[in-house]
């Protein structure tokens, strides 16, 4: 490093000869006053050249402040014109190429002309001479005293000013020099400091400095008040802490306890009595220890207290004792629900195994069936029969995974998931836990709740279920989980695989009648404040309500209509009518209005091209009519009725089969030439799809092509292949119930579905004739009036263009009844 020797500082009264032209050094973020000594770091090439020029002459250099601090290449317009002539007292070249100079301000100057710009700025200056101040001026003397006193006061308030400066200030007698010295030491903004430098009159400049000192005094006063308030608050908190500690010590000496200590001791006892697993108990005591060390008002203290409350309230070791009396359990199940034998048998099997083997995992069941068949209420009965607590949570519309697993404790307002909340609500670790509407779970950017349920419903994993909030394992293996769904198709495969699925079919008319007599009518009479003295509802009236006012697989609408009848009777009783009201089929319309549904399928006669099919929907079975007609055309096939792709393909397959067997049906191979076929399924606003309408489509086409009428009392279901084989279908019981509601006498089913008849109650089978079909000819033999069909008058062509006559007494399906119908 190269160093230039020191130059002695000039005294204030020392004569100075300043040349007119000097090298210019632009400075940033500082204003240099006369007689001010400060170091400057010089790094720009143009500035280093200016320093070199000054050192090569008389060490004098002109310092002007830049208007913009970030300007790396300042122009003449970017610098203030009023600056300070300075002497370079010392120069040191640094290893990084920069130069450090120590300068002393000498006199103010005004730039009148920029002479050169390279290799360094050179300027012509005019020295600024300040006017003299009379020594006898009392006003000036008073101002100087006021300024000195103000400076002393702000230093006492904490303003950083060196003691040497204070000594110099006290001995100064010149107002201009006093103003410059104070301005250079109180940390003014660059704009304010430059404005002071440009004031030539010393007294005016000192007055401006006094204004800045007053402003600084006010700011420091406010700062002191803020700091005092903060210290006072901190001191108050510390004082409270010491007093609280002293109070605790005094209470301990007296054998007393403060409320917080008593609360923490109760929490400690609760943890000891909660029968937690060792790992959980260790964590609980650890968090309790943290809570004891915290100030009660600390933000984390509230969160820890809530966490520990959850820990002690969870039923870690609390369980209800199972009632293993199988006969009593059977009695309770029969009291609450009529029929549903399959589910009752499964519950009794569980109790029997539990009786023989004490330790076993809780079953995970899934009840699938239409709305209103008793899935949810069955869970309550199971809990009552087993002597367990019952918890139900609805999963319909749940889209956030945190609803199942909970939120992590770091979030404000975090809580455990609904599984842990349900167990706390139950107060035991082995309740009957119902997950209602499992098929209506959603998923979005917050996660997939169905995936979170995988751990809950897996017997191999749920003994170590970890909720995000608790973050400790909880044993769910003793819980008996029961899920409910309207359709199993929408439940994800991995979740479905973990459950034992039990199908609940819709109720028959006889079952509905029995349930209404045993449960619905007594319940509605009680809810509406009437008794058997005021109302009697006959069995036939109930049958009328079932047939003409409700069309459902379950019982909700039936109970609603019975409730409507009871309310109308209750009103009359309340008005003073003392009669005993007897509800008969003839008087039902008086209370419920005109019949909403007319039995389907009641046609006057057998018709050509109209076939009764059977469909399955999530709300039960439905009757599905298929119509086919032939007309002159170009051999086209038209399909209407909002049919799905599978159903359209069934029509194509049926037509291909008929064409392959045209000779047997007395049809020419080109029987489609010159004719169009139109297949329609009524209720066109409702989407329909599924493979099991194949035999229905084939029968309608054969009837339309051969002009052989279809029997009106025959319904059918089954899938067809190109070889004419009839394949099995699902939902047989629901379809048979729909056929019975429609007055059908004969039902044609696939031969491979004969095994399913064992699960259908005998009283249902007695109402219809069931015919099994292996091939489509078996179906046609039952459905058509004559089979094989006779040869038509015009051999080889369709028998005639048949337009199906209108059916009488057929009500349009209610809105939504066939939504998503699967044939």
Curated annotation (Swiss-Prot):
Induction of synthesis: By heat shock.
Region called Disordered, residue ranges: 788-823
Catalytic center residues: 692, 735
GO BP, sorted A to Z: cellular response to heat; protein quality control for misfolded or incompletely synthesized proteins
EC number: 3.4.21.53
GO cellular component: cytoplasm
Positions of ATP binding: 369-376
Pfam family of the protein (one): Lon_lid
SMART domains: AAA, LON
Domain Lon proteolytic: 605-786
Cellular localisation: Cytoplasm
Disulfides per UniProt: none
GO molecular function: ATP binding; ATP hydrolysis activity; ATP-dependent peptidase activity; sequence-specific DNA binding; serine-type endopeptidase activity
Chain ranges of the Lon N-terminal domain: 22-217
The entry's keywords: ATP-binding, Cytoplasm, Hydrolase, Nucleotide-binding, Protease, Serine protease, Stress response
Membrane recorded as keyword: no
Catalytic activity: Hydrolysis of proteins in presence of ATP
Enzyme class: hydrolase
Complex formation: Homohexamer. Organized in a ring with a central cavity.
Family from the record: Belongs to the peptidase S16 family.
NCBIfam families from the UniProt entry: lon, PRK10787.1
Function as written in the Swiss-Prot or TrEMBL entry: ATP-dependent serine protease that mediates the selective degradation of mutant and abnormal proteins as well as certain short-lived regulatory proteins. Required for cellular homeostasis and for survival from DNA damage and developmental changes induced by stress. Degrades polypeptides processively to yield small peptide fragments that are 5 to 10 amino acids long. Binds to DNA in a double-stranded, site-specific manner.
The name this protein goes by in its record: Lon protease
Organism name: Geobacter metallireducens (strain ATCC 53774 / DSM 7210 / GS-15)
């Amino acid at each position: 490093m190269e160093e230039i020797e020191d130059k002695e500082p000039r005294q204030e009264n020392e004569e100075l000869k300043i040349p007119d032209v000097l090298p210019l050094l632009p400075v940033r973020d500082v204003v240099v006053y006369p007689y001010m000594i400060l170091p400057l770091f010089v790094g720009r090439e143009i500035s280093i050249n200016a320093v070199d020029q000054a050192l090569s002459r008389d060490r004098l250099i002109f310092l002007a402040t830049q208007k913009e601090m970030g300007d790396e290449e300042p122009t003449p317009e970017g610098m203030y014109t009023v600056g300070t002539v300075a002497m370079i007292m010392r120069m040191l070249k640094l290893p990084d190429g920069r130069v450090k100079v120590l300068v002393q301000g000498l006199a103010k100057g005004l730039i009148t002309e920029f002479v050169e710009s390279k290799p360094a700025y050179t300027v012509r200056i005019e020295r600024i001479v300040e006017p003299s101040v009379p020594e006898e001026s009392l006003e000036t003397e008073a101002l100087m005293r006021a300024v000195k006193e103000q400076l002393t006061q702000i230093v006492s308030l904490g303003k950083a000013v060196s003691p040497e400066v204070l000594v110099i200030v006290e001995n100064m007698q010149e107002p201009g020099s006093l103003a410059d010295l104070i301005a250079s030491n109180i940390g003014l903004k660059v704009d304010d400091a430059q404005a002071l430098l440009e004031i030539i009159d010393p007294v005016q400049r000192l007055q401006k400095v006094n204004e800045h000192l007053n402003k600084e005094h006010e700011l420091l006063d406010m700062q002191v008040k803020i700091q005092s308030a903060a210290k006072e608050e901190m001191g108050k908190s510390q004082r409270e802490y010491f007093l609280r500690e002293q109070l605790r010590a005094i209470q301990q000496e007296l054998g007393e306890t403060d409320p917080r200590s008593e609360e923490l001791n109760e929490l400690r006892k609760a943890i000891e009595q909660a029968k937690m697993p060792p790992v959980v108990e260790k964590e609980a005591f650890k968090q309790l220890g943290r809570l004891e060390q915290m100030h009660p008002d600390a933000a984390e203290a509230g969160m820890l207290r809530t966490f520990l409350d959850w820990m002690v309230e969870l039923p870690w070791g609390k369980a209800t004792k199972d009632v293993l009396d199988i006969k009593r359990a059977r009695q309770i199940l029969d009291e609450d629900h009529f029929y549903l034998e399959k589910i009752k048998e499964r519950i009794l099997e569980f109790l029997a195994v539990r009786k023989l083997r004490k330790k076993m995992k809780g079953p995970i069941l899934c009840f699938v069936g239409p709305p209103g068949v008793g899935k949810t209420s069955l869970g309550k009965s199971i809990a009552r029969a087993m002597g367990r607590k019952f918890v139900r949570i609805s999963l319909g519309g749940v889209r956030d995974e945190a609803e199942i697993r909970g939120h992590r404790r770091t979030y404000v307002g975090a809580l455990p998931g609904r599984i842990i909340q349900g167990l706390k609500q139950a107060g035991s670790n082995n309740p009957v836990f119902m997950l209602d509407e499992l098929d209506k779970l959603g998923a979005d950017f917050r996660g997939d709740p169905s995936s979170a349920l995988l751990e809950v419903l897996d017997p191999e994993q749920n003994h170590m279920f970890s909720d995000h909030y608790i973050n400790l394992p909880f044993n769910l293996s003793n819980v008996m989980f029961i899920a409910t769904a309207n359709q199993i198709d929408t439940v994800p495969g991995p979740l479905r695989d973990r459950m034992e699925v039990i199908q609940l079919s819709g109720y028959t008319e006889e079952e509905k009648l029995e349930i209404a007599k045993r449960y619905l009518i007594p319940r509605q009479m009680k809810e509406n404040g009437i008794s058997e003295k005021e109302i009697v509802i006959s069995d036939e009236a109930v049958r009328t309500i079932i047939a003409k006012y409700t069309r459902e697989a379950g019982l909700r609408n039936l109970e609603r209509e019975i409730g409507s009848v009871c309310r109308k009777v209750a009103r009359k009783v309340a008005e003073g009518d003392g009669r005993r009201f007897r509800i008969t089929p003839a008087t039902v319309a008086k209370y419920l209005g005109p019949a909403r549904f007319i039995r389907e399928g009641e046609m006057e006669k057998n018709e050509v091209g109209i076939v009764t099919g059977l469909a399955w929907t999530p709300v039960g079975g439905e009757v599905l009519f298929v119509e086919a007609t032939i007309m002159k055309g170009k051999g086209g096939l038209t399909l209407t009725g909002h049919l799905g792709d599978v159903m359209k393909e069934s029509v194509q397959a049926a037509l291909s089969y008929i064409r392959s067997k045209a000779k047997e049906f007395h049809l020419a191979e080109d029987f489609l030439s010159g004719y169009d076929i139109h297949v329609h399924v009524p209720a066109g606003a409702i989407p329909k799809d599924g493979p099991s309408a194949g035999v229905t489509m084939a029968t309608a086409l054969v009837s339309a092509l051969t002009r052989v009428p279809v029997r009106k009392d025959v319904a059918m279901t089954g899938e067809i292949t190109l070889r004419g084989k009839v394949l099995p279908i699902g939902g047989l019981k629901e379809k048979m119930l729909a056929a019975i509601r429609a007055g059908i006498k004969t039902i044609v089913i696939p031969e491979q579905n004969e095994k399913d008849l064992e699960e259908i109650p005998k009283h249902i089978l007695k109402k219809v004739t069931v015919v099994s079909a292996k091939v489509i000819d078996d179906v046609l033999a039952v459905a058509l009036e004559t089979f094989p069909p006779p040869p038509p008058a015009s051999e080889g062509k369709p028998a005639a263009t048949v337009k199906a006559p209108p059916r009488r007494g057929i009500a349009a399906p209610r809105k939504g009844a066939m939504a998503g119908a699967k044939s």
